[in-house]
Amino acid sequence: MSYGLALMEITDKATINNDPHPDLFDELVSVLHKMDTQENRLNILFWYYEMKLLTLLGFKPDLSMEGASEAKFMDPGGSPNSRNILEALQTHSLDTIPNLSITTKDRKIVGAFLTGYMRYYFDYSGPLHSFEFMKKLNS
């Protein structure tokens, strides 16, 4: 449930009131349905939605990092699988995301990369309230 709340929170931060985004809404509903049935893939589904949100709103991450001055501080290749994970999220549909091997380091790198993009383009700082709630539950 916390991941679902986080999806709602980032959608709210990234969109303007009364500015319809039917494609984004469809992706949100689809990801929420998948999260309900694939609890073992919550991270990958969350990242997929972040990537889709960025792409649909015109901020598709440049994974090549060549000339990406706005994101030089974010290295998508900082772990063994992170670039492959990000490329899979960009190139696959929700129904075709492969089962990926995700290490702890991958989780940190991919999460930081996507969060960095979200914060850069949507100008929000601080942790998501839903993630802070999850941390408290898990501690």
Model-derived features with residue positions:
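Non-catalytic alpha-helical scaffolds and adjoining flexible linkers that form interface surfaces
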Residues: 1-139
